[in-house]
């Protein structure tokens, strides 16, 4: 009887919404979410009149970052209203809008219209990307079907299901990491926020997906290790830990990452995606903002490069990259692998790339697009094509190095 009552209440509520409002869905910040920063809230956003929740963080330079997402049905006309708490003196759109139209309505309001789902748009207001007010908006495709409530493991589909709400993994399961293997899955529904780490280990067809978010202030957020034919799609990753790579693909093949939104603006060693000793992977339509490498392709180990695996057949496309430190797209610096080959970085936007907030202009081994080889190996069949760069300290860097980070990492160019 209770389920019937809830269903009727939902139907009645939908009946009260305007037709266009039923084509979108927003989710509130769940009760218990622990990482809201005590910062000025410069933005208020509504989507077809529905309030959109904004999460926040800060830049190294004291600027503010707000970000949020909503869902819409593809092909439907949708209007997003962005209101500022102060007059707009400057407005920069990153990248140039492709899937939406943006116009300033008055001195404190911006209107965005679209009929296409699955896009990402950044607004920089009243300042530069380092110190201004930055808003990252993410438009996701509407998740159809009945969404889960609470947490449960669905045995027939081998899926961990998280409905809307806040979940502390350690309190929920006794461990801060949820690991799946084989062809198991983890689904984060819209409005689900999981505090912990999600991991695929020894996977074959495993998947982490959904429009929810994973966050923590301790370690990496998503890892794929020793796996084949696995995928991570659509989730938001918001890191608060220092010296922890956000997303790692390690010793794996045929891994696909698509539609992810990845954040950690805290200095440093907080790479967005690290691909380590892995091949035949695809990274598509992701937004990555990190206070270190946005993307790094590495060969790690104590072996000679000639004894390592080949890092080959990697595809990166339709990305938006923002690095407050190091590189937007980098190969290295650790290059303990037999070769790097058949790597494609195409049709993407580098929104902002800066060398280092503390050691500005003192490090010459970093750039928006960079190859920094500490260990002698071979590079061939690499393609950088159709890349729009909006802000960068240095566009391209290529070099074989004897050491890295003030001598803390020693290089060896013998190749043995």
Please state what every model-predicted region is:
Residues 22-416:
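Extracellular/periplasmic carbohydrate-active domains that bind, remodel
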């Amino acid at each position: 009887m209770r389920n019937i009552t809830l269903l009727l209440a939902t139907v009645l509520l939908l009946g009260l919404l305007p037709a266009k409002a039923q084509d979108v869905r927003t989710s509130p910040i769940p009760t218990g979410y622990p990482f809201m920063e005590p910062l000025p809230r410069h933005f208020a956003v509504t989507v077809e009149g529905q309030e959109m929740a904004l999460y926040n963080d800060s830049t190294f330079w004291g600027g503010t970052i707000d970000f949020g997402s909503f869902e819409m049905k593809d092909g439907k006309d949708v209007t997003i209203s962005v209101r500022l708490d102060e007059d707009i003196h400057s407005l920069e759109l990153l990248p140039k809008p492709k899937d939406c139209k943006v116009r300033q309505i008055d001195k404190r309001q911006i209107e965005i219209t679209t009929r296409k789902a699955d896009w990402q748009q950044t607004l920089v207001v009243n300042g530069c990307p380092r110190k201004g007010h930055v808003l990252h908006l993410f438009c996701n495709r509407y998740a159809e079907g009945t969404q889960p409530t609470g947490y449960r493991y669905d045995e027939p589909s081998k899926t961990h299901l998280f409905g809307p709400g806040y979940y502390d993994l350690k309190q929920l399961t006794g461990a801060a990491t949820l690991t799946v293997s084989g062809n198991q899955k983890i689904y984060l529904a819209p409005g689900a926020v999981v505090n912990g780490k999600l991991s695929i280990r020894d996977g074959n067809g495993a998947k982490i997906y959904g429009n929810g978010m994973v966050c923590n202030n301790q370690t990496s957020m998503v890892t794929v290790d020793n796996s084949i034919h696995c995928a991570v799609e659509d989730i938001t990753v918001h890191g608060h830990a220092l010296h922890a790579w956000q997303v790692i693909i390690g010793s794996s093949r045929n891994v696909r990452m698509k539609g992810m939104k990845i954040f950690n603006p805290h200095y440093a060693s907080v790479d967005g995606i690290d691909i380590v000793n892995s091949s035949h992977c695809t990274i598509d339509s992701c937004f990555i903002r990190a206070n270190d490498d946005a993307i790094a392709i590495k060969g790690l180990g104590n072996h000679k490069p000639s004894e390592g695996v080949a890092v080959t057949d990697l595809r990166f496309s339709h990305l938006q990259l923002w690095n407050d430190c190091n590189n937007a797209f980098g190969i290295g610096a650790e290059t303990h692998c037999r070769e790097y080959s058949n790597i494609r970085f195409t049709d993407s936007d580098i929104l902002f790339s800066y060398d280092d907030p503390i050691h500005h202009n003192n490090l010459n081994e970093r750039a928006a697009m960079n190859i920094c080889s500490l260990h002698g190996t071979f590079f061939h069949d690499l393609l950088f094509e159709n890349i729009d760069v909006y802000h960068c300290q240095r566009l391209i860097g290529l070099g074989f190095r004897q050491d890295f980070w003030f001598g803390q990492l020693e290089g060896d160019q013998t190749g043995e």
